[in-house]
């Protein structure tokens, strides 16, 4: 049986925890919070460390050195990371839902995720090329497809 169906998040070992990440890259997108409404908006401006084709961090093990504001996702803080998309495996499992049909642990590769449009592949730009984040607000990362 799949480990994510038999263990609680806090019971996962580091390898299992890391494997839950589908590598979509959505958590690496810059977000904006509206000052008046507190509404969260995603942009297509990705962290400078994100490889936008492979959808993974170029310096994952040193990311906190390069980007001090980068957030580590842990079982202890998942409830407070309200900016994570609903499609995030950590969020889904925290909410008592299963992994989606396109998840790499289910399919064996990232291709189904990319084909379902659930990653930032081909959709993001580097944050260093962006002048005004407000001009880069997008809606596509928010959908959740099973």
From Swiss-Prot:
It holds the Pfam family CxxCxxCC. It comes from the Bacteria. InterPro entries: Puta_zinc/iron-chelating_dom (IPR005358), UCP006173 (IPR008228). Coiled coil: none annotated. Belongs to the UPF0260 family. This is UPF0260 protein Sama_1927. It comes from Shewanella amazonensis (strain ATCC BAA-1098 / SB2B).
């Amino acid at each position: 049986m799949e480990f994510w169906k038999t263990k609680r998040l806090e019971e996962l070992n580091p390898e299992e925890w890391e494997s839950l990440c589908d590598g979509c890259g959505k958590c690496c997108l810059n977000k904006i919070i509206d000052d008046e409404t507190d509404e969260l908006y995603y942009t297509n401006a990705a962290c400078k460390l994100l490889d936008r084709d492979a959808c993974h961090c170029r310096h994952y093990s040193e990311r906190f050195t390069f980007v001090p504001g980068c957030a580590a996702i842990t079982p202890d803080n998942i409830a407070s990371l309200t900016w994570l998309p609903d499609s995030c495996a950590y969020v889904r499992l925290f909410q008592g839902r299963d992994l989606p049909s396109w998840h790499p642990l289910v399919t064996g590769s990232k291709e189904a995720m990319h084909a379902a449009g659930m990653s930032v592949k081909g959709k993001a730009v580097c944050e260093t090329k962006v002048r005004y984040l407000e001009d880069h607000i997008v809606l596509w990362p928010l959908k959740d497809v099973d």
